[in-house]
A protein has these predicted regions:
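Hydrophobic, membrane-interfacing alpha helices
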Residues: 1-216
């Protein structure tokens, strides 16, 4: 029973992103070859995140890992491991973009509906199916973002769309902080400073890219 309880979050995470990728494949008007390329890139990045979460879990519990490695592997990952995984994965993604292995704008345009649908499915599964975990506030926020995305994604320039979604998500999360004790993303409690940092870094990257294109 304990083993099943530990496998449930992994299964829900995998099922949610599988649903997000399937939704992207069905609804995208890209060619099959481009869809395949984007899906391979997204799966690679998601695998990186999962691997780095496990590495982060080991690093944040290094003393216990030295004493009893199996105990750490059975121990649930915490927010620090999640932060570390996002940081390292972001750096690797940035390097791949700089080296020309990934085209940033098309990749993000493909990844946004995947992450939104995956987030929606994750919260839905916990709230409706498992009836444990998940928060109605974040579920509503993701639902609104998903609706907003599909209303305006063909009407706005890509980078303006990225900024709008980032602003709405960040503002929505801070509103949730004011009415509930914590906010979770894929089961990990995220602190306000992480939201600010995530928002700031992404806004700077988007605006710098716009400025460079404008100068060129």
């Amino acid at each position: 029973m304990a083993l099943i309880s530990k496998l449930i979050p992994i299964g829900v995470f995998a099922l949610s992103f599988a649903g997000g990728i399937l939704f992207f494949y069905i609804t995208s008007d890209l060619s099959k070859n481009n869809k395949k390329i984007h899906i391979e890139q997204m799966v690679s990045e998601l695998i990186n995140v999962v691997i780095f979460i496990w590495i982060g879990k080991i690093l944040t519990n290094l003393k216990l890992f030295i004493q009893d490695p199996l105990a750490v592997l059975a121990y649930p990952s915490d927010s620090q491991a999640f932060y570390l995984a996002i940081l390292i994965s972001g750096i690797i993604l940035f390097i791949n973009v700089k080296r020309g292995k990934i085209n940033a704008v098309p990749f993000m345009k493909a990844f946004i509906p995947v992450i939104l649908v995956a987030s929606f499915l994750y919260e839905f599964i916990y709230l409706v199916w498992l009836q444990t975990g998940g928060t109605i506030g974040y579920f509503i926020l993701i639902s609104l973002l998903l609706i907003l995305y599909y209303i305006v994604h063909d009407q706005l320039p890509d980078k303006l769309l990225f900024i709008m979604l980032l602003v709405v998500w960040s503002v929505g999360v801070f509103i949730l902080y004011s009415i509930q004790p914590f906010v979770t993303v894929f089961g990990y409690i995220i602190a306000p400073w992480f939201v600010w940092l995530f928002f700031t870094i992404n806004i700077v990257i988007i605006l710098r890219k716009r400025d460079r294109r404008g100068r060129n």
